[in-house]
Design a protein with these regions (language model features):
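Extracytoplasmic metal-acquisition and chelation regions
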Residues: 16-343
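Bacterial N-terminal signal peptides
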Residues: 1-13
Length: 343
């Protein structure tokens, strides 16, 4: 009996202890929502900016420094959206999550950036030198962001690589299904479905091919199916944050209330936007909920359009905590307006 007890004690004493939970910090809540899909129960995820907060202008707080000081992984866009991030990292002095450290993840890596300026001038407003940084508004980009987070997690927690990989692959599959429908992903396989989306060949492919005697187009579902009602149409936008959404769902921002990013619109420009919306009979004004709601509603009222005011980031409005819920709010909000106009 004593020998057995000693053997058990030795066995438990030499077993590898479970690694402590990872502390993941993200600049934006949307990156946090994606990170949670992968981290699962192996860690905690904390976001610095609030979901209904303009990510360009976040007021640094001492508590943010403390969060970053203890972080194992930090996810940020990596462009010039969150100019408040570098000073926080400097003050935190955590080499693990400082730029170049193993726990520093740039969400934009591998994403084809849109609206890269040909010249830089303050006369154009707060333009982004490397391109539009609102990368998460395209679900395909969300897959790339998830893959970047996975790479970072493997660096800081190699013992959890298999666990994180399984969860990331599951997230990808569910996101593809939400984008184009479960049936189509099942027929194509997730790998082919992703490739067709990433190369912008999906519509051409499903328009030319059949499965079991029926056009593949009939198997389309998800957000792309719901967005067919506004595909090829125009909307007005408040700020230049929907470029990737517009590109994926093929709905153009015909004009912007905020013509120059970061600079309040002049009364003359607002009147020009109203005139254009009336002339083209644009039915929707798409805007994030951290902009001036009164101005958004006034422009919409003067044009007969509907103001579709949404959270740009996860958790920025009730019912948008997950990335899936967030995209649902965008697509369903616009689809309701364009369905009404089509009836």
């Amino acid at each position: 009996m004593i020998a057995t007890t000693l053997l058990l004690a030795l066995a438990f004493g030499t077993a590898n202890p479970a690694p402590p939970p990872l502390k993941v910090v993200t600049s934006l809540t949307t990156y946090g929502a994606i990170a949670r899909e992968i981290v699962g129960d192996r860690g905690t995820v904390t976001s610095i900016a609030q979901g209904n907060e303009d990510p360009h202008f976040v007021q640094p707080k001492p508590s943010f420094v403390a969060i970053l000081r203890d972080a194992d992984l930090f996810v940020t866009t990596g462009l010039d959206l969150e100019l408040w991030v570098p000073p926080l990292l400097d003050r935190a002095n955590n080499r693990k999550v400082s730029e170049g450290g193993p726990g520093y993840v740039t969400a934009y890596t591998g994403i084809a950036l849109l609206e890269v300026p040909t010249s830089l001038s303050r006369a154009h407003g707060d333009i982004h030198a490397d391109g539009n940084p609102h990368i998460h508004t395209d679900p395909v980009n969300a897959i790339i962001i998830a893959r970047n987070i996975l790479v970072g997690l493997k660096r800081v927690s190699p013992e959890g690589a298999d666990y994180f990989t399984r969860r990331e692959q599951d997230f990808e599959k569910r996101l593809l299904e939400a984008t184009m429908g479960t049936d189509l992903v099942s027929i194509l396989t997730p790998a082919v479905a992703y490739k067709l989306l990433a190369t912008d060949q999906l519509w051409d492919f499903i328009g030319k091919n059949s499965y079991q005697g029926a056009p593949l187009m009939t198997r389309l579902g998800g957000w792309l199916k719901a967005g067919e009602v506004f595909r090829g149409k125009e909307m007005a936008c408040y700020h230049k944050e929907w470029a990737y959404f517009s590109n994926r769902f093929k709905i153009a921002c015909a004009e912007f209330v905020e013509a120059k990013p970061g600079i309040p619109p002049t009364p003359r420009h607002v009147e020009d936007v109203i005139a254009l919306m009336k002339e083209r009979r644009i039915p929707a004004l798409f805007a994030s909920n951290y902009f001036d709601r009164n101005q958004i509603e006034q422009v919409a009222a003067k044009t007969g359009a509907t103001a579709v005011v949404v959270a740009e980031n996860s958790g920025g409005a009730p019912g948008t905590d997950s990335y899936f819920d967030l995209v649902n709010s965008w697509v369903n909000g616009l689809a309701a307006v364009y369905r009404k106009g089509a009836s």
